[in-house]
Amino acid sequence: MSIESDVRMREVLAMVAPGTALRDGLERILRGRTGALIVLGSDRSIDQVVNGGFALDVAFSATRLRELSKMDGAIILDGQAQQILWAAVQLMPDPSLPTDETGTRHRTADRVSRQTRHPVIAVSKSMNIVAVYVDGRRHVLEESAEILSRANQALATLERYKSRLDEVSSTLSALEIEDVVTVRDVCVVAQRSEMVRRIHHEVNNYLVELGTEGRLLSLQLNELVAGVDKDRMLLMRDYLVPASNRRKRGVDNGLEELDSLSEVDLLDLARVAKAFGFPETAEVLDQSVTPRGYRLLARVPRLPDVINDRIVGHFGGLPRLLAATTEDLQQVEGVGEARARSVRDGLSRLAEASILDRFV
């Protein structure tokens, strides 16, 4: 499954989610016990598979879609389902295109989608279902209650994973203060962060299908995962192995490698360590590492990112930063006496809180 195909499917599912005019029209067709074949988009590729019918070019409405579905033939909408372009057209895709569908309407929908790269919606009269075809993929729309049940289960799982992520992140912060961090400690946080992101993506897919009926879940989800992506990026900036002359490597490369790990590989901490630029060996997990200080500085209030970068660049590592006095901090460009005192006090409070959280 390509990323582009995944994005296109999400876009179409958002268009047919509860609360949209298109979903209202589809439900009217189902209740009326009639079938329908609806193409989203029109260009030269569609012209090649269309025969007959008549042009309309009128504004879309659920009632118009329902009435037009009573006629034989397919309905052509514009790509955003804002206009009804054609009705009662015959679709004649290439019959040699492979398809696993059996019904005439669904076979046609699948082949038109594959040939034209346009989404096609098939409403089945006999099975009373709505199937969406995008780039050779098929997705059957489900009742909101079923999707909501699965979304709630996934959200409960996400809450447990997020709680565990908070625990290991707090432990890592305390270890950073004491300067006793190992590669294993870093990889555990990265692993948990990636797990949270993946479940977040799964819940997001459910929310797309729920449309307006998923608003409360969306608020819970956004609150639950707030800051996770930023913390993941700061972790990579803190521990990414510097690039060698032979191999250019940046934070984005490391994050992409983490994102590309399979579910099985993500459980292997050595594979996670490789995303940070460490050798893919079990021995490296016990190697000591020193953070640069991005994670801790990001928790100091009212400190711009550009100042964070300058402070990290000046001191070169968290131990030297924690040992720095107010006068030392003032040597950094853009850090005056007031800001230096704020940074010094903020770091001291964070250090005390991190150690207390670990041992209390």
Where are these regions (language model features)?
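Long, highly charged, low-complexity intrinsically disordered interaction regions
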Residues: K230-V332, E337-V360
